[in-house]
Amino acid sequence: MVSPKDLVAIVHSSLLGTSRPTPTQRIELTHAIRNSFPSLQNLLSFPPPKPSDRAQVQSKEIRLPDSLPISLDDQDIAISLKLSDELHLNEIDSVRLLVSSNQEWGLMGRDPLEIQRLATGLWYTGRRDLTSTLYTLLRAVVLDEGLEPDLIADIQGLLEELIEAGLRQRLITLIKELNREDPTGLGGPLCERYLIDSRGALVERRAVVQRERLILGHCLVLSILVDRPGSKDVKDIYYILKDNAAQLTEGNDTISSQITFSLLFSLIITFVSDAISRLSDKSSMISQDASFRTDFQDIVMASGSDPTADGFIGGIRLAWAVHLMLIHDGISGMDTISTASTTDMGHICSCLESIFSKNVFQFLLDNVLRTAAYQNDEEDIIYIYNAYLHKLASCFLSHPIARDKVKESKDMAMSVLNSYRTSDPLDGSMQTEESDRPLPFISLMEFKEPELLSGNDVLWTFVNFAGEDHTNFKTLVAFLEMLCTLASTQEGASKVYELLRGTSFRSIGWPTLFDCIRIYDEKFKQSLQTAGAMMPEFLEGDAKALVAYLNVLQKVVENGNPTERKNWFPDIEPFFKLLGYENIPPYLKGALRKTIAAFVNVFPEMRDSIWAFLEQYDLPVVVGSQVGKSDQSSQVYDMQFELNEVEARREQYPSTISFLNLINALIAGEKDVNDRGRRAYSDPCEKWQLVVACLQHFHMILSMYDIQEEDLDGFTEHPHFLVSLETSSLQTQLPIIELLKDFMSGKALYRNLMGILQVGVNSIISERLSKTYGKILEKAVQLSLEILLLVFEKDLLVSDVWRPLYQPLDIILSQDHNQIIALLEYVRYDSLPQIQRSSIKIMNILRCSRLVGLVPMLIKIDAANSLIEDYAACLEGRLEEGEVVENSCDDLGVLIMQLLVDNINRPAPSITHLLLKFDLDAPVEGTVLQPKFHYSCLKVILEMLEKLPNPDINFLLFEFGFQLLCELNLDPLTSGPTMDLLSSKKYQFFLQHLDTIGVATLPKRSGSQALRISSLHQRAWLLKLLAIALHTGSGSSSAHLEACQSILSHLFGREVTEAANEPFSSSTYPQDGLDYAGTSSISKSKALALLEILQFRSPDASMQLPQIVSSLKYDSLVEDILGNRDTSVSGSIYYYSERGDRLIDLSSFSNKLWQKLHSGFPLVDSFPNVAELSEVRETIQQLLKWGWKYNRNLEEQAAQLHMLAGWSQIVEVSACRRISSLDNRSEILYRILDASLSASASPDCSLKMAFVLTQVALTCIAKLRDDRFSFQGALSSDTVTCLDVMMVKHLSTGACHSVLFKLVMAILRHESSESLRRRQYALLLSYFQYCQHMIALDVPTSVVQFLLLNEQDGEDLDIQKIDKEQADLARANFFIIKKEAQGILDLVIKDASQGSEFGKTISLYVLEALVCIDHERYFLSQLQSRGFIRSCLGSISNISYQDGTHLLESQQRACTLEAELALLLRISHKYGKSGGQVLFSMGALEHIASCRAISFKGNMRRVDMKLQSDVGYNVQKQRTIITAVLRLVFALTSLVETSEFFEGRNKIVRDVVEFIKGHQSLFDQLLREDFTQADDLLMEQIILAVGILSKVWPFEENDGYGFVQGLFDMMSKLFIASPIKSILSQGSELKLSQLRFSLTSYLYFLVTKNSLRLQVSDDSLDSSTKLRQPTLLLLASLLSHVTDSLERAAEKKSLLLHKIRDINELSRQDVDAIIKICDSQEYVTPSDNIHKRRYIAMVEMCQIVGNRDQLITLLLQLAEHVLNIILIHLQDRSVSSNERGSYGSKSHIQQEVTDLCGKLSPTIDRLALLNEGKVGHNLKVFQRLATTVKEMAIQKCV
């Protein structure tokens, strides 16, 4: 069985939605009704208490169906039994109710009484859901609301089944039983009187039960319209009506009255509809039962002792009489039933006699139709009541018997009463009410539903009958009042006008009205002209008749045909003539002014003439005449005298009210506004009418008139001057100034207005429902609040000028906190949304800096809790509405949500903290939110976002709800509590909204663009909310971690795996990478589906004006208006929406257009001709349509970007922080990358969207690049294989091709910008970097070969195959680029030449990357042919025209220079000799040499960046540029090696030498640097400088620069072993070996080419030589050191390779030791398993092995150089001869040679013992050389 809560939700969504129910909803509805058939049939019938069940509860354990046993404690038992006793509920059901209450509210920590009240409230909520469901079903059948006929037929069939099964009898029984003072009804005397409803409010149980009875009464009424009742039901309803009517005398209870009305109208509808169905030959239930007619006649004619009950019985008699009349006509036509006909006639006559004698019509007017209870009932029910009253009256008036009775009553009245022109107050007691018995009843009844008058010939026939021969004013007035009602429609107004214009009636017509006015005007004029004459008396009869005439005329004018009514009353001056006479009755003046006001509203063109007539006849003298003025001789209207002396005596104020209303009507129509306060009341309605009229006047003054600067020119801050202004004539002050001064000083008007509001919202609600003036009082409250808002808008404009006598309104309010509370509590007033709206706006104003400490004040005076519940109830009530609010600024829900959002960041405690029930007694950030425990806006919002009720209506509330939660999660104070709350399982329904909202079909723009816009924003905030959860979710919280895993699973559609506490992917990757570029069985993830939602062409939001405007002469005027986009400027036509979009204010736009257009034509509406005016109107209409469309399109464009921003956030956060927990994450990243590129290349993608999409693609490619080298071992094994270490996750070739192709298309998109292309270039560079390596960068090739040889499954791995695949990928990349090369090069070269410095830099790097992938010298030729290389060199050279140090102040320009050098260097490296030749031929060395950016003076070492950030950055950047220049020069020196020369120098050598000479200081300083203290950059510069010198300086004959000695000095430092240990400790052994290699290369060149011969030792050096050359002993020392290094490197390499091979056999301790030795502890956490540890250790060891292998290679080459140099010297015979004296004596030389050979011999022996297996190189040639040297050394020693 469907629960009541689900049932009512299904019924409401299906039948009360804005759109028709879908087929699924219809099936669900029918199924739910069928399943709930027993509950509806036995409505509110529940199992009673049972002793056995009570015993089971007392046993402290019960078992509910489909649940585990429930244990109860003593408190649970006590509450359950009390619920059973007080609700007459079964004990088991009481326990079930308690369990449900705990699930709904959370009962932990609550006291027993509160728990009981909550459970009782839940109980009655379920009952209400059932009754509401029944009411909705009945209403859908009875009222035509556009539902499908077959659906209505199905529901009607089900309802008829229910009624036949006894539903109506159950309704009647319930209405009776629920009125009893016992547990089954209102509750016994010992029962708890209060309960807590679904909104958390404490309400009286009696009120809830009475409301339940009322709904049942309404259901009873509707059930009669579905299926007519039988005689038993009629009698039962009659007796209940009689009992209820008798109880009405006990008090004025609105709901009790409405229940009685439902019973009354149930019988009226029954009698009327049954009789009518008899006449139409339809089935009739009671009209065919003659015995029932006799019995019921006796029952209904029995008189009672209670007058109220007898009055309601009189109404039943009226309906019964009409019933008998109708069936009498049918019976009379049948000859066989003449006796029954005669009997019924007697019954009719007796009923009519009773009806007229007891004046039932007047009773129905006073006690039913005019009561507040009737007027405040449900609108649909009132409509049904009025419709059947109309049928009742029509049937009554159409019958001859009734008409005869009316005529008899009328004749009797006219024979008793005097003529309507006579009036004697003394005869009032003798004048009965016989005159107007049926007419006022008919008038009011017809006024209720005027549309029912259309085509009612019966009524018009009665009008002609009733309008004849009126001889007294009372019958005339009654008749005219009926005509006034009949004129409420256009058809009726025309008929009434014609009726009174013609000769239908002898003494009634329009001429009578005007003749009477003329006669009295002449009498009064004659009296004024006669000295000492008294003003004649205005007869009461004439006055009241005139009032009735004027009311008819007013209705005729207001509702007449617009075309015809212009000619009906051309002269309106007579209506003004009587206004100036003091003896005119005030009510007559009121009627005259109301009539005039009608003309103002209907005919605006008459406004000027009406003002003129008012000035002539009716303008009052409000204050005394000014000094110096003489008394006026003419009659003047003294409003104060009339108000205080005339109307106050009568306690009636029609004249004053009408005057104010007339003035208000005139003011409301003003367009040019630059030239411009205890009484007794006989009728309380009139009191509040007067108040409303005054308030409307003040409201219009404050809203229509603005304060200009010149209005404040006369004010000064001097207090005395302000006082003098107060004493000045009021006539010299603007009305708005007077009003503001009153409010800002808390004077009379302010006090009176606050007196209205401080009555309190509860009292206003009570009077609204129980008093006839309730609606007028409600209007007064509404106006009062709106006036306060208007004052708030203006007070700050004048407060600075008027201080200190006048203060802003908030200061005045804060003098009494009760005033503030009174204003804020009106949010509780749910009868009129405008009042709630004003209260919320006042709260929004006060919460700002207007009133500091608002929340503490509310807490202090104990008003906070009620306000929290009131706001929650207001928001919940808004959610339950079934209508769309057109203007979101007036939407109560939107206002509350904006209030909450805007106050999140306010200092704590803020209004948001209060209304969302954060803990304000402790730090807000420590709150534990419990929305189930507390009724607040948070509870309502979370339930709203969970269920998403009425999405077509509440879409804005959903949007702001998601936004609120996002903002709460971002705020430092509220993020913790909110995230903890949303991470709980109850609120993980947000994930489901990825389906219900996220990937749902986007609403069509043509259907509802507002819904479409909001739908995009909803998705954006939802994605942002989930992104925040992923970003901030704490790993220490299992709830947070589970929430994050669920989000990822829903978003990407993958299962999440976990190892220990760290999540890892469980997949392994094959050698060939992931093949998901082609077909795949994997379904599309929600992330991709969300992106597809976004891919639509953005609507045009440009400022291009419509064609009709641009082709006319108004285009410049419109552009001028639209040009000023500053919203802060007064009169701006732009405003910021609640979402922050800057939109056009269409109202301001229209006003500004008219103002500008009228400036050319000063007179309003005075255009040169009609055609010009028509053209202007058409233009403005077109502009307003364009403005509306512009606003919508701009909002949709912003919404699309907003959703894209939300999508990008959740994708990027997932990729960066959480995606490691997903399987196949590389596949996910690829798919997002591919989809992002596809979307950005689409022609529908805007520039802003492409920017965001490119950023997402950048993130994905970066994560793919990083993810290639992450640990990918299988979780199920502890072993590590070579596959784990060697292979990287790599996209397949097809996938890479797809990415590159789409990226190229995105770069070449039609709409682009440099900023977008910069990101696309960065993406292209990242892609090329990604494609470079398929084997892990940390694993050298030599190690890979070793792993392949030792891996058991090594045959499955083929390095050559992998290399081939990589080559194929690179070649394919080239051809894809080449296909679109022209377009790409056009863009890149343009950006590199003309773009910003940022654009130039990255464009140059793109060109470098293109050169990198060039396979056919294609890009080189393109760059040459386009002249870009030469341009690039020129750019470098042009720096010489500036100061180099000044250049470096432009840091980005330095980056551009670095990029230019990198491009040239890439050309040289990529194309080898040909590339170098191209550069050289273009004068690259000359251009580089002229670049002053490398003209550096100072220390080349690293600058302390902390001390001088700017200078330090510039120096560091210059060091980088110098390094780049040296790299390029070194690359060009490769041409020297391949050039043909003999001993002379060619051009290449000359140019390089000239470069060196030009930068002598640079090279000199580098040679003198202490390399033992150099950083990596400086060390590279030293190596490059030595390398350059070693290549070209041997050809320089003149060593005047000292470079040779510098190189020799460096050799002497590096070739000895003393500093080696300290250097090795710094990890720079490889760099030092490179430097030694360059030096030995230089020395080898000198020895071989220049025939340089070295001395054996320093002792043999000639002291006369200038150069301190290295010696052979120094080289022998170097060779010994190199041998040591070779042995250490080979041994370490061998050891590590063996450890790598045995890694799976090592224990965890051994593995950890390796990790520690490798200094890689940061990559390991204590929770990592042995598999990951082995992987990390293995990768680190592979890297070290690679470094050792590189060092070994370099050392072998270095040793080979040294051996060759020594060999050359040993082979030279001069070493052993005595021919050259410079070598010393023979014995000394021989000794040196012997020492040299002795030092070489052990070193060479060690070199000969090097193991090729350990070294990893072929040593045959090397060892042969070493053997040769050893042999030669031995020979020399012999």
From Swiss-Prot:
Name of the protein = Nuclear pore complex protein NUP205
* Pfam families linked: Nup192 (PF11894)
What family does this chain come from, according to its entry?
Answer: Belongs to the NUP186/NUP192/NUP205 family.
Organism (species): Arabidopsis thaliana (Mouse-ear cress)
PANTHER family in the record: NUCLEAR PORE COMPLEX PROTEIN NUP205
Q: How does it assemble?
A: Part of the nuclear pore complex (NPC). The NPC has an eight-fold symmetrical structure comprising a central transport channel and two rings, the cytoplasmic and nuclear rings, to which eight filaments are attached. The cytoplasmic filaments have loose ends, while the nuclear filaments are joined in a distal ring, forming a nuclear basket. NPCs are highly dynamic in configuration and composition, and can be devided in 3 subcomplexes, the NUP62 subcomplex, the NUP107-160 subcomplex and the NUP93 subcomplex, containing approximately 30 different nucleoporin proteins.
What is its subcellular localisation?
Answer: Nucleus envelope; Nucleus, Nuclear pore complex
Q: Could you provide one GO biological process annotation from this protein's UniProt record?
A: response to bacterium
Q: Where does the signal sequence lie?
A: none
Query: Could you state one GO cellular component term attached to this entry?
Result: nuclear envelope
Q: Which InterPro entries match?
A: Nup186/Nup192/Nup205 (IPR021827)
Q: Does the keyword Transport apply?
A: yes
Keyword terms: mRNA transport, Nuclear pore complex, Nucleus, Protein transport, Translocation, Transport
